[in-house]
C-alpha cells in the first residue's frame, strides 16, 4: 500500500480530472497502460488517452494508468502495483523515454530482461511512434512489440489474451501472427515461439499497420485536466499521415497515406465535448492541410469555443485560421522555419517557405493582436555551413524590425523566443542517407550561434544539449546492442553524459581488440 503522501498526491490528480473510466479492480482482465514519463507529459498525449479509452470500452477489460511520478510505481485508479496486471503496455513517444521503460521495470520489482521473466510476470508490450522508428533498443526488455495503430491492433490482441490466458507460450505464438506485431528475440527464445530473424544485430521491422479510415471512433481527449501541457483542453485529431515529404521527417515517408476526419464528424466531436471544456486543440502533422480547416474554424467561431493548433505550417496557414486563433485569445504564434537560410530549407523539403511567406504570416499575426512569436530551428543539418548558421540571427534581426513596426498599434513590442534543437537523422528518411556533420563541427556551429544570438535584442533562447542529441542518435539508429547503452544510462542514474563517455570507451576498446 502506498504511503499517505502518495495517496494524497494521486487523489488530487484524480479529483482534478473530468471524464474517464472507473472500474473495480479484479472484475476483468487487466492492462496497465504505462506512459514512461510524468503524469503532466503523459496526459498531454492524445494517443495515450485514445488507448486508455479503447481498452476500457471492452466490457471484460480494465485499463489503468501508470506514470513515472511515483516510486514504487502504482496504478493511478486503484493504487495497485504493476505486478498485479495481466499486461503492461508501454506507449513510447520519445526515444530518451526508452530509459524510463527499463527504470520502470526495475522500480516495479519486475526482472527487466525478457529472457529472465517467467509466465508469473505480466506480459510486457511496447508500442508508440518510437517503435515505428526503431524498436531495437527496447527489444531486450519487452516481450511483444506492436507496430500498429491502436484501433487496428487492440481488438485482436485483447481477444487472443482472453483466449490463451494462463498459457504464455500460446498467447505469444498467436500474437506473433498479427500484422505489425512481433515477439522480441529473447522472449521468442524463452518460449520457443516464432520471432524475427536476427542478422548483424538487427531484425526486420514490420511496416506499421494503419486504420484505413478515420472517424469511426472518437479521436479526442476523454479525460480533461488542468495538470497537462494543454490545461483543460480537449485535443481533437484532424488527420494522420502527412501530405508533405520533408526530408528529415519520419511521418511523411512512412506513415502515409494521409487520412483526414470528415468535417461533420469533427463538428459532432466538438459539440459533444463542450460540456467538458471551451478549449479545443487541433492535432495533426499539418493542421492547415485539412481540406476543410477554414470551415472547421468558422464552426468553432459560431460556437465561440477557443481553438489552438498543434502545428502550423507557415506555407499553408490561412487568414481564417489566424483570425480564429486570435479570437480564441492567443497571444503568440509558433512556426517552424527549421533553418535560417532558404538553401537549407529547400534541402529540408520546405521550398515553399521563402522569407516573404514567413513575414506575411508574422505581419498578419501582429495585425490580429498576437504580438509574441516562437520559432523552431535545427542546427547540425547535413551540408550546413557557418553562413547557414549565421542566417538564423540575421533572420531574427529582420523580424525585430517587423516587430517594432507591427507592434506600434498595441503599445508594446512582443517577445521573440526560439526552440533550438540538434538535428538527429531519422531512419527511413532521405536525410539519413547524407553524410552527417562531425560532432566537433556541430559543437562549433552551436558556439557561433550562441554568440550571435546574444547580440540580438529581445530574443529568448536556450542552447540545446549536444549530449542529449548524441544519446538520441544512438537510440534512433542503434541495433539490438543499443540496449547496452540504456543499461549504462540506468547504471549512471540517468546521466546521459556519463553513459556516453563509457559507451565511447567501450567502442574504442572494441576497435582496439
Model features per residue range: what roles?
Residues 1-20, 27, 31-33, 446, ...:
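Radical SAM enzyme core and accessory elements
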Residues 48-50, 140-142, 161-162, 253, ...:
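Short secondary-structure boundary/capping segments
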Residues 50-62, 301-302:
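Short helix-loop-beta junction
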Residues 68-197, 427-479, 487-498:
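Glycine-rich beta-alpha loop elements in corrinoid/cobalamin-binding modules
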Residues 188-190, 244, 291-293, 320-321, ...:
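Flexible glycine/acidic-rich beta-alpha junction loops that bind and position SAM and/or redox cofactors
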Residues 3-32, 39-40, 186-235:
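N-terminal [4Fe-4S]-dependent radical SAM core
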Amino acid at each position: 500500500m502506498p504511503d499517505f503522501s502518495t495517496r494524497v498526491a494521486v487523489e488530487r490528480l484524480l479529483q482534478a480530472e473530468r471524464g474517464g473510466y472507473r472500474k473495480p479492480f479484479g472484475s476483468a482482465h487487466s492492462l496497465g497502460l504505462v506512459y514512461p514519463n510524468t503524469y503532466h507529459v503523459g496526459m498531454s498525449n492524445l494517443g495515450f488517452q485514445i488507448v486508455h479509452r479503447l481498452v476500457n470500452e471492452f466490457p471484460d477489460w480494465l485499463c489503468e494508468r501508470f506514470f513515472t511520478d511515483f516510486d514504487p510505481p502504482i496504478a493511478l485508479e486503484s493504487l495497485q502495483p504493476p505486478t498485479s496486471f495481466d499486461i503492461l503496455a508501454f506507449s513510447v513517444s520519445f526515444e530518451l523515454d526508452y530509459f524510463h521503460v527499463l527504470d520502470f521495470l526495475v522500480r516495479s520489482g519486475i526482472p527487466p530482461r525478457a529472457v529472465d521473466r517467467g509466465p508469473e510476470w505480466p506480459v510486457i508490450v511496447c508500442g508508440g511512434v518510437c517503435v515505428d522508428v526503431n524498436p531495437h533498443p527496447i527489444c531486450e526488455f519487452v516481450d511483444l512489440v506492436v507496430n500498429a495503430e491502436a484501433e487496428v491492433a487492440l481488438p485482436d490482441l485483447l481477444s487472443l489474451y482472453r483466449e490463451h490466458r494462463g498459457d504464455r507460450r500460446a498467447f505469444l505464438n498467436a500474437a506473433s501472427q498479427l500484422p505489425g506485431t512481433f515477439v522480441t528475440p529473447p522472449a521468442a527464445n524463452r518460449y520457443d515461439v516464432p520471432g524475427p530473424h536476427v542478422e548483424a544485430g538487427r531484425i526486420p521491422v514490420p511496416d506499421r499497420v494503419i486504420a484505413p479510415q478515420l472517424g469511426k471512433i472518437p479521436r479526442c481527449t476523454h479525460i480533461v485536466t488542468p495538470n497537462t501541457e494543454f490545461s483543460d483542453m480537449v485535443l481533437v485529431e484532424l488527420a494522420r499521415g502527412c501530405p508533405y515529404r520533408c526530408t528529415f521527417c519520419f511521418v511523411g515517408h512512412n506513415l502515409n497515406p494521409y487520412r483526414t476526419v470528415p468535417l461533420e464528424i469533427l463538428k459532432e466531436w466538438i459539440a459533444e465535448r463542450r460540456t467538458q471544456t471551451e478549449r479545443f486543440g487541433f492535432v495533426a502533422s499539418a493542421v492547415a492541410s485539412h481540406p476543410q480547416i477554414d470551415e472547421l474554424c468558422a464552426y468553432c467561431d459560431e460556437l465561440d469555443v477557443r481553438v489552438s493548433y498543434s502545428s502550423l505550417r507557415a506555407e499553408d496557414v490561412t487568414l481564417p485560421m489566424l483570425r480564429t486563433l486570435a479570437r480564441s485569445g492567443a497571444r503568440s504564434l509558433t512556426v517552424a522555419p527549421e533553418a535560417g537560410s532558404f538553401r537549407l530549407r529547400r534541402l529540408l523539403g520546405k521550398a515553399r517557405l521563402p522569407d516573404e511567406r514567413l513575414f506575411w504570416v508574422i505581419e498578419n499575426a501582429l495585425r490580429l493582436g498576437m504580438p509574441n512569436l516562437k520559432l523552431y530551428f535545427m542546427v547540425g543539418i547535413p551540408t550546413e555551413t557557418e553562413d547557414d548558421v549565421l542566417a538564423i540571427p540575421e533572420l531574427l534581426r529582420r523580424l525585430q524590425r517587423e516587430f517594432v513596426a507591427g507592434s506600434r498599434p498595441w503599445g508594446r513590442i512582443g517577445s521573440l523566443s526560439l526552440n533550438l534543437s540538434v538535428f538527429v537523422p531519422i531512419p527511413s528518411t532521405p536525410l539519413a542517407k547524407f553524410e552527417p556533420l562531425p560532432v566537433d563541427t556541430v559543437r562549433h556551429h552551436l558556439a557561433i550561434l550562441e554568440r550571435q544570438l546574444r547580440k540580438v535584442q529581445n530574443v529568448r533562447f536556450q542552447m540545446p544539449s549536444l549530449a542529449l542529441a548524441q544519446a538520441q542518435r544512438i537510440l534512433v539508429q542503434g541495433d539490438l546492442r543499443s540496449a547496452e547503452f540504456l543499461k549504462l544510462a540506468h547504471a549512471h542514474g540517468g546521466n546521459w553524459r556519463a553513459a556516453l563517455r563509457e559507451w565511447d570507451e567501450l567502442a574504442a576498446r572494441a576497435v582496439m581488440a
